[in-house]
From Swiss-Prot:
InterPro entries: AlgH-like. Coiled coil: none annotated. This is UPF0301 protein ACIAD0353. Belongs to the UPF0301 (AlgH) family. NCBIfam families: PRK00228.1-1. It comes from Acinetobacter baylyi (strain ATCC 33305 / BD413 / ADP1). Gene3D superfamilies: VC0467-like (3.40.1740.10). GO terms for cellular component: cytosol.
Length: 184
């Protein structure tokens, strides 16, 4: 049987997620392969505005539209990841989906500060990661549900609506879910 990888899909935390850090989250999976998986939480605001973050990095950002930085995950919370539309043209960019990239280099932050060449974007501090077969085990135990990623879910919806919207992509109203997902 061929293994199915989940790159460019989203993990949805079930209502009874025991891990407080991941409770009520939607995670965009930027990479999933035979070595493991990495992703960014796309619905947990950090309380930091993009302008504030850029100014802290000595990047003048007076013209940046109000936009909140996300708490991307528990690992390396000091590291920034920019999930954005477009092609991987920045110094440290990788394509993770059709017209979707992750960039970690400062040049994209300069472009964001000057409203140059960056379409829709989310800046996240930190990321989530799973070792080989760890995510598969968590999914088989019912620790995560999976939905397709789309630009609306990633970029357009207010953060506090993304968890419910991810469930709706599955045709499910989460209010009706049992705390025993996968254990009928």
């Amino acid at each position: 049987m061929t293994k199915q990888y989940l790159t460019h899909r989203c993990l949805i935390a079930p209502p009874e997620m025991a891990d407080d850090f991941f409770a009520n989250t939607v995670i965009y999976l930027a990479r999933h392969d035979d070595e493991g998986a990495q992703g960014l939480i796309i619905n947990r605001p950090s309380g930091i505005q993009v302008r504030e973050l850029l100014n802290d990095l000595d990047i003048e950002a007076d013209h940046v539209q109000p936009h909140e930085v996300l708490q991307g995950g528990p690992l390396r919370p000091e590291a920034g990841f920019v999930l954005h539309t477009g092609q991987p043209v920045w110094h440290s960019s990788i394509a993770v989906g059709e017209n979707l990239c992750i960039t970690t280099s400062k040049d994209i932050l300069d472009a964001i500060a000057h409203n140059e060449g960056v379409g829709r974007y989310q800046i996240a501090l930190g990321y989530a990661s799973w070792t080989k077969n760890q995510l598969e085990g968590e999914i088989s135990r019912g620790d995560w549900l999976i939905c397709d990623a789309d630009m609306d879910l990633i970029f357009n919806l207010p953060y506090d609506e993304r968890w419910d919207a991810a469930y709706k992509k599955l045709g499910v109203d989460r209010i009706w879910l049992s705390s025993e997902i996968g254990h009928a």
